[in-house]
Amino acid sequence: MNMKLSEIKNGNLSAEWAEKGYELPKFDIEAVKAKTHAEPTWVHFGAGNIFRAFPAAILNDALNTGKYDRGVIVAESFDYEIIDKAYRPYDNMSLLVCLKSTGEIEKKVVASVTESLKADYSFGEDWARLVEIFQNPSLQMISFTITEKGYSVAPADLERGLTPVLAMGKVTALLYERFKAGKLPLTVQSMDNCSHNGDKVKNAVHTYAAKWVEQGLVPAEFLAYVQDETKITFPWSMIDKITPRPDAKVQKMLADDGFEDNYTIVTEKHTFTAPFVNAEETQYLCIEDHYTNGRPPLELGGVLYCSRETVDKIEKMKVCTCLNPLHTAMSIYGCMLGYTLISAEMADEDLRAFIQKIGYIEAMPVVVDPGVLNPYEFIGAVINRRLPNPFMPDAPQRIATDTSQKLAIRFGETIKAYEARGLDKSNLILIPLVLAGYARYLKGIDDNGQAFEPSTDPLLAELQAIVAPLEVKEGEQDFSCLKKLYSRVDVFGVDLYAVGLGEKIESMAKELFAGPGAVRKTLHKYTLAR
């Protein structure tokens, strides 16, 4: 018997699915599809792996409870090949492979996506269907996973009138169709991993609408409509889940099971996709509960609805304390110690102790506690399940990208919080060690004395020029150039000398530069002492 996604629709299922641990939909797929076609409630823009692994899977879980009866319609506005190659041949179904830190995997067929559409005027039928959906009073929410770049507005696109090519322009054009259908209410929901994401969508939509009014293409009432929060809202959200490219190890496991849809697809635009999607087990989606026309009950699948202030606190907890600072510490030292996998770093006793103590001892005293998520449970999941996960092929080199843009929020905010609360900054030892490590990292020489290429960064050449006089060697040398680095408020969020940490960091940097092996020796010394 074939184990193919197309067989599920037919209901002609072999016992092999259950025997091999595949969880199948518990709802009537065709009934949900018909109901959604007639009365759509949710359109999602961005057909990539994160959508299938998270929002679509959450809705699948909600449908499995029997308490909801509508699916989600996916629209792709950038890489149309995804629709042709990863959705339609499989009746819009996919296999979610959940990768656990224990090495176990869970396999679940996701059948909550009822239609897949190419969001562009050149695809006449698809665009007409999107217009029809946006004109339907039943539509409650549109959402996005299109990356932060997807919310950009280009001057040239604003001059294209009502047929723009960028995602936000197309969405604004569809909102105009909804406006013409009777100024119908709708919630416009970003689910991308960037702070205050709702404002990014709002600003883009308002920019297009204002320009079109100025050009005389739409009435002024349209701008008033998208600015009226009784009609259109742009809630904030915090999303957190790692969804890597389709993994060869997972592909082999599925092939060994007899699951036939196990190949990977690379589009002309270099999107890596497949009929299956592999992702980590841990996931968080917290959404500001500000809807104008109702919403799908995604809490049935684990979404946390809360206030805007709480979403902001959750974001700060993650970015300033419980995840991102640990990532950056591991990336700087991982690159210098020759690691290429974050999971491998977690088997290094010095590095594991380093990030544990940064999180629990130094950052946690000033953590922003959102109340609805426990910071200790969150960081515990990061250290014990997420970072050691052997299925997550994340590299310190990837995380080290744009480090100069990240240090202020990931460490500067903690230092500022110590200042604001009058806490003793002499208790900060390992956070200064991270910042001292940054000067050593900028040299591009690893702990064995071999050259490595630091990750791309807009300030890389400028900051490397500051540390250029320094050498990785034993003996005396002039470290006065570091003053120019560690007084950079734009990089660190504070003048580290003004807050009394500059000299401590300089002293640590001197130890890190003291020849091959000095990085390991210094890391071990301070981590053990802490």
How would you describe each model-predicted region?
Residues 2-45, 49-530:
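Substrate/ligand-engaging "lid" and interaction regions
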